[in-house]
Swiss-Prot record:
Stretches the record annotates as Mediates interaction with SMAD4: 377-584
Lineage, uppermost ranks: Eukaryota, Metazoa, Chordata, Craniata, Vertebrata
The protein, known as: Zinc finger and BTB domain-containing protein 7A
Effect of residue 404 to R: Decreased transcription repressor activity. Acts as a dominant negative. No effect on nuclear localization
Positions of region (Disordered): 220-313, 486-584
Signal peptide: none
Length: 584
């Protein structure tokens, strides 16, 4: 081959994924680079968030919920057993599930609670088929107790997840935070009275937030000024100007968490992106315009013009806090007839929706959420601006437009023939390289195109899928049927005897209707019969057959040899030409 094909080449490594998983499992067993600890029944399970989130939908929602999910490093759960969690951890890191009759029930329950469908389906199948049978001696009372435990564990799992999804303690005033802190979720297995007290504390915290007692800036503790993230004015050390709000010295203090040290690539929602000045510039451009922002709480900072607050520099947690306050005011004033106030609240909600669904998507949402968007894009419909034809599939519209413009961007390096599609060029290159990748498994014949192999296989199978609706004649290939209908013409009379092999160099077989007189010259054929015979002479062997005359008393036989003139009569004079059998 004279030259290589332009463009990137994808080289797969089949063992890469298993090697990566093996390396992660080695890190887990040695306690290296683990960023979260799961505490169950007093046992600690150091692990990686990303691995658990990739296997379990429950852990994915747990690790991505709340404003400070990155600061939560220990999760204590009591709705699964330590033995079941050990088996699920091994499955996540080794792609192998180890079950026994003793623990298959616990593993099934844990897999359902943690939303691991692959494991739950396998365990359920093992129990249904009695491959791993449960305890057959269990009575009805024990089964009811197991069901009650499962229902209780399901309720606890939901409440545990809802707590971190709402995460009210992260934005409480100091008094409410102190009250709620006395009921940590680390004591999740406490009595029902403790759980009720925790719910009351959470409800009081939400009520305080809705009443506007929290301005959203208490999320960060006071801390020394040196520990605060720089709010710089464009200095070199300020890698993210405008991302952190300037703290008012008179603002309330005593937040739950110490002020985080600003990372080089911290984004407005607390996650980490590319970092640097380019990231800050992109975030500043993507944020909504200050003029579009509505009025906020009295605790918000005023803008430069004094007409409205400047919220573009606030963190996402602060904006979310203010949105919750606006929702609380909207609920309190539901019976108010002042349309102007309701319009202001609607403007607040519109602004927040615009902010959180803005151009931050590429940095906020992880790759797993973009897969769904990619699938939707692949099924999208696009209309051609030239012929208005609807094209299904993303990326196919430019290829269709080339049929209008005549553009052929793909050129053969050898013969300089150009093509509109790259796959057509790839097939064309087989003419130069002699490559025939399609091999017949029965006779070993090789072909350059898959459709040639498909047609060849019908020689072995005897399949003739294309049939004429008028004469019921069948064909191996569709182009043969089209030629039969267009070029040859179909008389609509079905054949009585079916197919007949081509006669090569000999006299045609005598038919019952033939009345040629021995020794007499053959009657010259009519022009129509001569033309029909010449066309049939060049037809493929599998397409030749006798065509009955309309009255069924005579037949037209076509002999081989290429002569076009008439020959002498007699029994042995049928070596050249076309002969017409006489009609009785």
């Amino acid at each position: 081959m004279a030259g290589g094909v332009d463009g990137p080449i994808g080289i797969p490594f089949p063992d890469h994924s298993s090697d990566i998983l093996s390396g992660l499992n080695e890190q887990r067993t040695q306690g290296l680079l683990c960023d979260v600890v799961i505490l169950v029944e007093g046992r600690e399970f150091p692990t990686h968030r990303s691995v658990l989130a990739a296997c379990s939908q429950y852990f994915k929602k747990l690790f991505t919920s709340g404003a400070v999910v990155d600061q939560q490093n220990v999760y204590e759960i009591d709705f699964v057993s330590a033995e079941a969690l050990t088996a699920l951890m091994d499955f996540a890191y080794t792609a192998t599930l180890t079950v026994s009759t003793a623990n298959v029930g616990d593993i099934l329950s844990a897999a359902r609670l943690l939303e691991i469908p692959a494991v739950s389906h396998v365990c359920a199948d093992l129990l249904d088929r009695q491959i791993l049978a449960a305890d057959a001696g269990a009575d009805a009372g024990q089964l009811d107790l197991v069901d009650q435990i499962d229902q209780r564990n399901l309720l606890r799992a939901k409440e545990y997840l809802e707590f971190f999804q709402s995460n009210p303690m992260n934005s409480l005033p100091p008094a409410a935070a102190a009250a709620a802190a006395s009921f940590p979720w680390s004591a999740f297995g406490a009595s029902d009275d403790d759980l009720d007290a925790t719910k009351e504390a959470v409800a009081a915290a939400v009520a305080a937030v809705a009443a506007g007692d929290c301005n959203g800036l208490d999320f960060y503790g006071p801390g020394p000024p040196a520990e605060r993230p720089p709010t710089g004015d464009g200095d070199e050390g300020d890698s993210n100007p405008g991302l952190w709000p300037e703290r008012d010295e008179d603002a309330p203090t005593g937040g739950l968490f110490p002020p985080p040290v600003a990372p080089p690539a911290a984004t407005q929602n607390g996650h980490y992106g590319r970092g640097g000045e380019e990231e800050a510039a992109s975030l500043s451009e993507a944020a909504p315009e200050p003029g579009d922002s509505p009025g906020f709480l009295s605790g918000a900072a005023e803008g430069e013009d004094g007409d409205g607050p400047d919220v573009d520099g606030l963190a996402a947690s602060t904006l979310l806090q203010q949105m919750m306050s606006s929702v609380g005011r909207a609920g309190a004033a539901a019976g108010d007839s002042d349309e102007e106030s309701r319009a202001d609240d609607k403007g607040v909600m519109d602004y927040y929706l615009k902010y959180f669904s803005g151009a931050h998507d590429g940095d906020v949402y992880p790759a797993w959420s973009q897969k769904v968007e990619k699938k939707i894009r692949a099924k999208a419909f696009q209309k051609c601006p030239i012929c208005e034809k609807v094209i299904q599939g993303a990326g196919k519209l430019p290829r269709h437009i080339r049929t209008h413009t005549g553009e052929k961007p793909y050129e053969c390096n050898i013969c300089k023939v150009r093509f509109t599609r790259q796959d057509k060029l790839k097939v064309h290159m087989r003419k130069h390289t002699g490559e025939k990748p399609y091999l017949c498994q029965q006779c070993g014949a090789a072909f350059a195109h898959n459709y040639d192999l498909k047609n060849h296989m019908r020689v072995h199978t005897g399949l003739r899928p294309y049939q004429c609706d008028s004469c019921c004649k069948t064909f191996v290939r569709s182009d043969h049927l089209h030629r039969h209908l267009k070029k040859d013409g179909c008389n609509g009379v079905p054949s009585r005897r079916g197919r007949k092999p081509r006669v090569r160099g000999g006299a045609p077989d005598p038919s019952p209707g033939a009345t040629a007189t021995p020794g007499a010259p053959a009657q010259p054929s009519s022009p129509d019969a001569r033309r029909n015979g010449q066309e049939k002479h060049f037809k493929d062997e599998d397409e030749d057959e006798d065509v009955a005359s309309p009255d069924g008393l005579g037949r037209l036989n076509v002999a081989g040899a290429g002569g076009g003139g008439d020959s002498g009569g007699g029994p042995g004079a049928a070596t050249d030409g076309n002969f017409t059998a006489g009609l009785a």
